[in-house]
Amino acid sequence: MIISTTSQLEGRPIAEYLGVVSSESVQGIYFVRDFFARFRDFFGGRSQTLESALREAREQATEELKARARQLQADAVVGVDFEISMPSVQGGMVVVFATGTAVRLK
């Protein structure tokens, strides 16, 4: 399954547009459990805890997007866009939304 942020695939013409596919992934960020990691992450300028949660959420959302496109018998998903939401940093949650257009290639 090809996943692309572009609307077309070079050298692979689109035969049919099958519709919009979307997915979401919610990851917990357990800052409360590891206060020292939070402290280190904050003063270190980068939050490894948050980066890890974002990476995992993006990977899960991508896999779900592929699964939904396969249900439509798609060859690829084009125009993929990821949106990130953090409903509450204190609540320790990150949400990644993925959307794209499922297509069949020639």
From Swiss-Prot:
Extract the Gene3D superfamilies matched here. Answer: Hypothetical protein apc22750. Chain B (3.30.110.70)
> Which stretches are annotated as coiled coil?
none
Provide the transmembrane region boundaries: none
Q: Which InterPro entries match?
A: UPF0145_dom_sf, UPF0145_YbjQ-like
Name the protein family. Answer: Belongs to the UPF0145 family.
According to UniProt, the name of this protein is: UPF0145 protein PP_2873
Write down the species.
Answer: Pseudomonas putida (strain ATCC 47054 / DSM 6125 / CFBP 8728 / NCIMB 11950 / KT2440)
